Structure formats: structure tokens, C-alpha cells
Amino acid sequence: MESTPTMQDHVRNAAPEQSATATRTASEQIVAEVGAWPGVVVDTGELGEVAFAVGRREIGHVHGDHAAHFSFPRRVWTELRADGRIEHHPVFPDATQGPAARRIASDADVRDVIELFRINYDRVTAARG
């Protein structure tokens, strides 16, 4: 019987000391990068998602290696949507601010998801002072 990976498995598997030839999954790459930013806490959410937070503010989460979800203010959401970087969140398909989704299907998507996390990280840390 195969078990679902835990947050500790993701963190352990994303350790920087892995050999250069080791292939990391999308979520392992994202956990390794975003989880290394000052003040970021990585945890497993109620639905098994890997969530990233600064203080009490979630900056986004990933569902396995295939999707990332975020929340952005209207101006940022509109710009990112116009640029094709985010889509409507599947639970909130009519939203024009707040919930957003990004599919992860390639290395370029992984890099952009990390950049989207950085947008929220910079926003949250700037607000905290």
C-alpha cells in the first residue's frame, strides 16, 4: 500500500545536498526555494496541500506537482490574468480578485509559480514592515 507523502517527505526530498543528477518534482523544487525565504513556514493543509505562510498570512499553496493557488488584490490579479500567468481558481470561477490558480506542467511553470509566490511574499513582508 502506497502512502501519501507528508510535508516532512517533501522537505527531506527537497534538501539542497541532493546530487546534481537527482531529479526533483515540481513541488520539491517549489518547497526548496520558497521554504528557504526568511520567515516562510511550510506546512500541510487540511486537504493535503503544501501551504506557505509568512506569520499568519498564507502566500499560496501547491496541490501536488500540478497546481498552485494564490490570492491577489484586484490590481495584481487583473495584471497577472491579462498576462496569462494565472487562471480563475476552480472553486471561485467568477472571481476578479483574490483566488487564482496556476497549472504546473513544465519547468517554466515551476519557475513562474515561484515568481508568483515571490510577488505575494514581497507584498506580505512589505506590509509587515
Q: What residue spans do the PLM features occupy?
A:
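Generic structural signal for short, solvent-exposed loop/turn connectors between secondary structure elements
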Residues: 1, 43-46, 129
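Generic signal for short, ordered secondary-structure residues
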Residues: 9, 13, 34-35, 59, ...
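Charge-rich, low-complexity N-terminal segments
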Residues: 1-31
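Short, structured beta-strand-loop surface elements
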Residues: 5, 76-129
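N-terminal first-folded block
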Residues: 23-54
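Short, conserved beta-strand/beta-arch hydrophobic-aromatic motifs that form part
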Residues: 45-96
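A general boundary/transition motif marking the beginning of the first structured unit of a protein
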Residues: 18, 22, 68, 105-108
